[in-house]
Design a protein with these regions (language model features):
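Catalytic-core regions built around general acid/base machinery
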Residues: 63-75, 207-218
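Accessory, non-catalytic peripheral segments of nucleic-acid enzymes
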Residues: 264-404
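His/Asp/Glu-rich metal-coordinating catalytic cores
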Residues: 56, 87-236
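A short helix->loop->beta-strand "cap" motif at the edges of active sites that frequently abuts
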Residues: 73-79, 173, 237
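N-terminal active-site segment of His-dependent metallophosphoesterases
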Residues: 1-69, 76-77, 177, 396-404
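A conserved active-site cap/scaffold subdomain adjacent to cofactor or substrate pockets
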Residues: 212-216, 220-285, 289
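Divalent metal-coordination and catalytic microenvironments
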Residues: 9, 49, 64, 85, ...
């Protein structure tokens, strides 16, 4: 038997409304170590978005490297495969790969190439008991550079599989794929500040909306990242998103976070189970729907004093103001460990806050996150999401304006 631990979308370093969440990652890493101790996996795959930023802080980097050192010290036979996601810097992940190899860690931050094009065989990792096709986050150029009449993501995986089959030979071991992408039918939230910030490009075989049935059948399992909710891809029993280990935004507050454990018998997937990861710090919307100030005040006052939590306040948009925000923080939450993270975000494209067709007022828009407004309007007008490049450019501009 060969056992895999599948995880993804750690987003180390991501804050929430400016609040540091280092403690939550520290607890997650402790739980991860405990799970490895109890489950004894042969391999751990991290399917992209290790970091939340292309330029991680020293604190984030230290947590990452300390974890790798601890895992290698405690479990020297554990193999680890790490691929990049759309939030990761390919070069940053790749830089220490030669050193990390001595810790039984294989990092694939970018598509391998030489003068003749893509080197599919260099992204195939032979672990003895399994073969891994370590596909990083694919960009348009990665797929287009394959050539051919209709280059596609499915064709990319087919070529990876062909390279893996050659490496495997006659051995009765599984071939495991890795990916960081969105599949058709995947359930995810559309908060631009949360999980989906990548381009959707159907001109290249659908860089995002991949039909799960287009993945080659001969993969024993495909470990996916990019969607933060744990779920199966389509009705394919052998293709799963592990989900993220902690909720990244309030739109993910009800997600059930977990680690995925996969067992293989010979070349086939034989069993699937999960290890639940209870939320370290709860994310709560108070109250549970948009309300007037009196209802909000009563709900906030009923929160326990000694329980740490992040809260999003569901106050009707026309009642919001800097004065109300100050009153919430200084009066209603005084003496409580609850941290105010802002007002509930609401859509702006085509419908009002309360569900009718009236346009939103300037005052209502001023209470909202600028990035959410831009992303929502763009998707409504263009029927597609902002590309990651444009989203990053806009974030930079917004941050620069905020600092002036």
């Amino acid at each position: 038997m060969f056992r895999l631990l599948h995880t993804a979308d750690w987003h180390i370093g991501k804050s929430l409304a400016g609040y540091d969440r280092t403690g939550e990652w520290e607890v997650f890493f402790q739980r991860l170590i405990k799970t490895i101790e109890e489950q004894s996996p042969d391999l751990m795959i991290v399917a992209g978005d290790v970091f939340d930023s292309a330029t991680p802080s020293n604190v984030s980097a230290n947590m990452y490297y300390n974890l790798i050192e601890t895992l290698h010290t405690k479990y020297p036979t554990l193999k680890i495969v790490i691929t990049s996601g759309n939030h990761d810097s390919q070069s940053y992940l790749n830089a220490p790969k030669e050193i990390l190899h001595y810790f039984n860690v294989d990092v694939v931050g970018s598509v391998a190439r030489d003068d003749d094009g893509i080197c599919f065989d260099k992204m195939v990792i032979d672990l003895g008991g399994a073969i891994v096709c370590a596909v990083p986050y694919l960009r348009r150029g990665d797929v287009m550079s394959m050539g051919g009449e209709k280059p596609s993501v499915s064709e990319f995986y087919q070529r990876m599989l062909e390279a893996a089959v050659k490496v495997r030979g006659e051995r009765q071991v599984p071939i495991i794929g890795v990916g960081h992408l969105t599949t058709i039918g995947a359930i995810y939230n559309k908060d631009i500040n949360s999980e989906i910030t990548a381009t959707r490009d159907d001109s290249v075989g659908g860089l995002e909306n991949i039909d799960p049935h287009e993945f080659p059948d001969d993969f024993a399992y495909i470990a996916l990242g990019h969607i933060h909710r744990r779920q199966r891809a389509g009705n394919r029993e052998n293709i799963w998103y592990s989900g993220s280990p902690i909720p990244m935004s309030f739109s993910e507050k009800d997600y059930s976070n977990s680690l995925s454990i996969m067992d293989f018998d010979g070349r086939q997937l034989s069993e699937i189970h999960t290890v639940e990861l209870p939320h370290v710090v709860k994310l709560r919307r108070v109250p549970d729907k948009l309300s007037d100030f009196e209802t909000v005040a009563n709900a906030l006052q009923q929160l326990p004093d000694d329980e740490e939590m992040f809260i999003e306040v569901a106050l009707n948009p026309d009642l919001r103001s800097p004065e109300i925000k100050t009153r919430i923080i200084n009066e209603l939450l005084k003496g409580k460990k609850a941290k105010f993270c802002g007002f509930q975000l609401v859509g702006v494209a085509g419908a009002s806050i309360l569900g009718d067709d009236a346009p939103m007022s300037v005052e209502q828009l001023q209470t909202m996150d600028p990035m959410t407004v831009i992303a929502d309007i763009y998707q409504a007008r263009m029927h597609t999401q902002l590309s990651d490049r444009h989203a990053d450019m806009l974030r930079t501009i917004i941050d620069e304006i905020a600092e002036t």
